[in-house]
Regions:
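Aromatic/basic-lined ligand-recognition segments
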Residues: 127-146
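Small/polar-rich, solvent-exposed N-terminal microdomains that initiate assembly or binding
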Residues: 1-64
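Scaffold/interface architecture of coatomer-like assemblies
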Residues: 53-56, 60-62, 67-76, 107, ...
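Oligomerization/assembly interface segments of phage tail-like spikes and tubes
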Residues: 75-91, 104, 148-156
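Acidic, glycine-rich loop-and-strand cores that form catalytic or ligand-binding grooves
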Residues: 99-124
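Short, charged, low-complexity patches
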Residues: 2, 6, 78, 99-103
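Single conserved hydrophobic/aromatic residue that forms the stacking wall/gate
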Residues: 157-168
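Short, conserved charged micro-motifs
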Residues: 94-97
Length: 168
């Protein structure tokens, strides 16, 4: 489900930005942010997951449910996950002003699409996260030390039952 979130967000943001900017290559890409971006990653908006945490404000339900036979069956309780996504303008220093403009348009996209429908997964919410300069410095240090203009977004995902791997 997380890969569907990041891929859908990248595709929709790329469609939005492509209507404003005529470029042969894609503008938005999901991937890790490298300290020294390679040619494929340079001059793009990069979406990168920087943290995943369990949201407990929704409550943690009991792992049992009532069945049709009035018996109880053990289940996996649903999880709510906070996915932190860094939206960074990874451009060469010569294209700094262009990177700021494209990042600004990316923020407009996020504002206009704060609720995003995922294919066969339901909807997710997107909201900007305010972090201190110290926290921002820590994040960029972990990502390799080179700062790029960026915004941090939070997405809430609901995972109702384990799907792919099943239970042991």
């Amino acid at each position: 489900m997380i890969h569907v979130l990041i891929n859908t967000l990248a595709e929709k943001m790329n469609e939005f930005l492509s209507s404003y900017y005529e470029r042969a290559e894609i503008i938005v890409e999901a991937g890790s942010i490298d300290a020294t971006p390679n040619e494929d990653q340079s001059d793009k908006i990069i979406l990168s997951i920087v943290n995943i945490e369990r949201e407990t404000a929704m409550g943690i339900s009991a792992p049992y449910r009532n069945t049709k036979n009035n018996t109880f069956q053990q289940t996996s309780p649903p999880w709510y996950l906070n996915i932190y996504i860094m939206v960074a303008a990874v451009f060469s220093s010569k294209r700094y002003l262009e990177s700021i403009q494209i990042l600004s348009d990316s923020i407009s996209f996020l504002q206009q699409n704060s609720i995003l429908k995922l294919p066969d997964q339901g909807t997710i919410t997107l909201e900007p996260v305010t972090i201190s300069i110290q926290e921002l410095s820590n994040i960029w240090s972990i990502l390799g030390g080179h700062y790029y203009p960026s915004i941090l977004c939070l997405s809430l995902i609901h995972i109702s039952e384990p799907t792919r791997l099943g239970m042991i």
